[in-house]
Amino acid sequence: MELLNGVETLVSGIHHHHRTNAKRNRLVRSVKILNSGNHEIPRKCLCFDLYDKLVPYKKAWSWQKSIVEEKKTLIDRNQDCADTVILLQHSPVYTMGTASTEDYLNFDIKDAPFNVYRTERGGEVTYHGPGQLVMYPIINLRNHEMDLHWYLRMLEEIVIRVLSSTFSIKASRLDGLTGVWVGNQKVAAIGIRVSKWITYHGLALNVTTDLTPFNWIVPCGIRDRKVGNIKGLLEDGEHGMVDDLRLIDIVHESLLKEFSEAFQLQIEKQTVSDPNIL
């Protein structure tokens, strides 16, 4: 199986961290609701919406980095650049962050069940696969908040709002751990990288994901907690069974809505012009 070393000398992404009381008590910046009395114009965000496609991880990774470089070039020229968000699913793959070691793999890396990529994002090892919605915001934090902890909390907040507003599922953060949890189950993993205040990598939300491949790793380096998905939570609750494809559609719509509101962005759908992406 392919092992790719992709560590770059950029600003480190953050995955696990310990929060001080001040950080823990700090509220996520409130969202401004645009209405007739609010004349602030939201910034444009180019959206490559491939949520119903399986995109190979290596292609999406290279794509992100090329967009980051384009934005950095514009910034160096003192030109404005729109934010970007990519939404997709991946073919089955394991990715390792900057904190990862092979101790968290329950298999010989030379005989891995899927490709394994060592990346420059923060955090440990995780799995991506069909039924998991992956969101890669590539945004200029100079236009938002130049604070990586704030950015991580905002990504968590987006998922928490999706679960609450769409399914009335109460999700939460856990002190000292990055991600989103429902009870003892982690439903969303987050790992980022930032270069000159341009973000990439992002969040992965388990919707209908087959959870079996998580058994072959120690997800995010956490041994004493489970991984869950929205489908399982709904089956355990009062909502009952929901068709897999319909569930993906519903979560996708909610995810984009909450993302645009949280970061005050106007989503503009784009067409993927590079046939090599798919």
Curated annotation (Swiss-Prot):
The keyword Transit peptide applies. Residues 79-267 form the BPL/LPL catalytic domain. It is found in: Plastid, Chloroplast. One of its GO terms (molecular function) is lipoyl(octanoyl) transferase activity. It catalyses: octanoyl-[ACP] + L-lysyl-[protein] = N(6)-octanoyl-L-lysyl-[protein] + holo-[ACP] + H(+). Its main location: plastid. Keywords: Acyltransferase, Chloroplast, Plastid, Transferase, Transit peptide. InterPro entries: aa-tRNA-synth_II/BPL/LPL, BPL_LPL_catalytic, Octanoyltransferase, Octanoyltransferase_CS. The active site is at 220 (acyl-thioester intermediate). Its EC number is 2.3.1.181. GO terms for biological process: protein modification process. Expressed in roots, leaves and flowers. Expressed in cauline leaves, stems and siliques. Pfam families: LplA-B_cat. One of its GO terms (cellular component) is chloroplast. NCBIfam families: lipB, PRK14345.1. Belongs to the LipB family. This is Octanoyltransferase LIP2p, chloroplastic. It comes from Arabidopsis thaliana (Mouse-ear cress).
